[in-house]
């Protein structure tokens, strides 16, 4: 057969049509409730390795292979892997990420999946981004493009969270996460994405969040540390609360009502917009009395579950801990508050 220019053009058109059809089919095969199904599977989780030396030197890692297994055996369903890729920039125009970053990320993802833990890859660079959101946008987008491409072949048990606690004006955040969304969807059309609210992922800012109506494969993240005077008392980085002490949480009727009011606002938003919610962080700092921490932690986790939210406790190691790596043992009182009995 003799190929003419016209024939070649027709072949290219047909190939383009077939590829387009394939991509559309790939996106359409997910049910409209897929994000809710994913959120149910996320279940109960914990934040890991954000401040672990593993990122700089694997030989100095506090978090070991065994901890993935321990997390699963304790009854957790997900890990939120806290990543800081800005620290691994090669400082070139393309914001190339040092390969050592991907070595650690791959290790954490693969060990999680091996232990049947779902994974949230949490872009945890809010402290830098908030200083100049638009100025740092290009870096965030460039790095997400690299991470997304690198992770595109992982199963849908891996989720991407665009940015932790984006502290900026709502219109700026809506612009940035929209552009990040477009970057991620190029290489990961079926990946479940997580988008949080501004200013510490606070519930009150759900009303300002604008998401693509035609993409239902998105989970919305909120965080909860209220009352902040209780959860952050004695925390050295918290200017307003570092000198506070002795504040209890007794689970009084008024204290419960305050939590329920906040959570009901979030739940009403979720139902109105048909978007699942994940409680990506919650915890009470160690300076609070243990009995109060147990009561608060248990109440928050149970109220999230009553509303069918997934959750990820802050955090496994470092501070607010649920596991004592030095003693190689669970902080049993916090673990039991989070998971009173293993899910059947």
Name each model feature, range by range:
Residues 52-55, 90-102, 127-135, 163-171, ...:
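The substrate-binding groove and active-site-proximal loops of carbohydrate-active enzymes
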Residues 60, 67-78, 94-125, 129-159, ...:
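An active-site-proximal structural segment forming one wall of the substrate-binding cleft
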Residues 1-28:
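Bacterial Sec-dependent N-terminal signal peptides
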Residues 48-65, 87-98, 229-257:
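Acidic/histidine-rich helix-loop elements
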Residues 289-344:
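Aromatic-rich peripheral "rim/lid" segments of glycoside hydrolase catalytic domains that contact
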Residues 57-73, 140-144, 259-266, 293-297:
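Short, acidic/polar
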Residues 32, 141-255, 260-284, 306-312:
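Active-site region of glycoside hydrolase catalytic domains
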Residues 26-80, 95-96, 269, 335-337, ...:
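N-terminal carbohydrate-binding accessory modules
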């Amino acid at each position: 057969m003799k190929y003419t220019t016209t024939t070649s053009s027709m072949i290219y058109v047909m190939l383009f049509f077939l590829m387009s059809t394939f991509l559309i089919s790939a996106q359409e095969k997910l049910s409209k409730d897929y994000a809710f199904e994913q959120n149910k599977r996320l279940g109960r989780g914990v934040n890991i390795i954000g401040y672990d030396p593993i990122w700089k030197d694997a030989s100095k890692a506090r978090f070991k292979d065994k901890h993935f297994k321990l997390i699963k055996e304790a009854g957790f369903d997900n890990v939120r892997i806290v990543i800081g890729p800005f620290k691994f920039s090669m400082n070139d125009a393309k914001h190339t990420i040092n390969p050592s970053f991907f070595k650690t990320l791959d290790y954490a993802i693969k060990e999680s999946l091996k232990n049947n833990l779902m994974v949230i890859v949490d872009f945890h660079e809010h402290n830098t981004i908030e200083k100049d959101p638009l100025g740092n946008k290009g870096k965030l987008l460039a790095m997400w493009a690299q991470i997304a491409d690198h992770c595109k072949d992982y199963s849908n048990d891996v989720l991407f969270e665009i940015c932790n606690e984006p502290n900026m004006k709502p219109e700026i955040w809506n612009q940035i996460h929209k552009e990040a969304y477009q970057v991620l969807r190029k290489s990961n059309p079926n990946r479940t994405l997580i988008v949080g609210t501004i200013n510490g992922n606070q519930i009150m800012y759900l009303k300002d969040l604008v998401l693509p109506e035609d993409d239902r494969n998105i989970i919305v993240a909120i965080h909860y540390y209220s009352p902040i005077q209780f959860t952050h008392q004695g925390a050295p980085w918290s200017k307003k609360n570092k000198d506070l002490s002795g504040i209890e949480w007794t689970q009084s009727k008024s204290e419960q009502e305050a939590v329920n009011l906040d959570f009901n606002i979030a739940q009403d938003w979720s139902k109105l917009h048909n978007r699942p919610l994940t409680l990506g962080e919650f915890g009470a700092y160690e300076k609070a009395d243990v009995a109060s921490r147990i009561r608060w932690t248990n109440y928050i986790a149970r109220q999230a579950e009553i509303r069918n939210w997934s959750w990820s406790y802050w955090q496994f190691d470092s501070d607010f801990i649920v596991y004592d790596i030095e003693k190689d043992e669970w902080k049993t009182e916090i673990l039991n508050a989070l998971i009173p009995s293993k899910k059947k």
